[in-house]
Structures are given as structure tokens and as C-alpha cells.
Amino acid sequence: MLLRQIYDADLSQYAYRMPEPRQLTIDEVIGQLDDPTLVVLDTRADRAAFMKAHLRGSLYAPAKGSFSDFAGSYLGPDERIVLVVDSADQVEEQVRRLIRIGFDKIEGWLGVAALASANGTLASIRSVKFREVPALIAEDPDTLVLDVRGTAEYEARHIRGALSVAHTRL
């Protein structure tokens, strides 16, 4: 019961005023990318754009749909959060959703347009079609195939030798 009271008291600090994280510059964020307590949570809607160019080490949790599920799976209780958003009008809603699931260490936010000046700190993710995998493995037998689907999907059908780890567990 005491733990519940402490939790409720902790949440009540936001009962009247939601935190308002400030807009950060790209240089402020880049300067902290190597800090293990900082997580960049990229909330933009366009998954293909995220895969093409995102800040090194950032996690993708699109603002729509299962944002809270993804964020709750990816984030640790002591991590500081920087949001990457499509537009400034999304910040308040994403902050509210993070607060509701217990994450209040929101350092600030960055508009997706700022990534254009993130020289040298952008990463990309190559998407591979299922039919391309055998050729990749033949080319390099040490290729690790990581199947990030849910357990039921993996058990129904998967590539021999693939390691199954749901994306929410990475």
C-alpha cells in the first residue's frame, strides 16, 4: 500500500501542470549521443524515412498506434528521453503518453527537420526482402538472421538458424 501511495504522490505532481520539455538544437542532442542514460525516441510517422536516416542509436516508436507499448518496452526507468517529432504540435501528446506509463525524464524534443544538419551522426537500416536472405547467407555464412516478429509468427515459419527476439525485447 505504501508503494502505491508513493507512486500516486509522484504522479500527482503532474495533476495541474504537464511538463513542457524545451526544443533542443541538433548540436545539443549530438553532444549527448554517447551518454548511456540518454535515449532518442523517434516518433515520426514515416517508418521508411526513419530507416533511411535517423540519429545513431535512436529507437523508433511511431506516435500513432502502439506508441506507449513500444516506449514502455524500450525505455528503462532511469533513462532520459529526447523525442524526435514530425511537428511541434505533437510534443504535448507524446509527453502526456510517456508520463502516463511512468516515464517523466523527458529532456526535450527535436523536430525531424533538424536531422538534415546532423552531419556524421545519422545511421540507416537496410531492409532485406525475405527472398533475398538465402543469397546473403550464401555470400557470408556468418550472417546472423535476427527475426524480430512475435513468437507465434516465428514458430509458424522462420528461416533455419534465425535467432528469434521480438523487437520489443531488443
Residue map of PLM features:
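A short acidic-Thr-Gly-centered motif at the start of a beta-strand
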Residues: E28-P36, A135-D140
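A contiguous, basic/glycine-rich beta-loop/short-helix subdomain that forms a polymer-engagement track
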Residues: M18-V29
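A short, charged/proline- and glycine-enriched loop
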Residues: P36-T37, D78
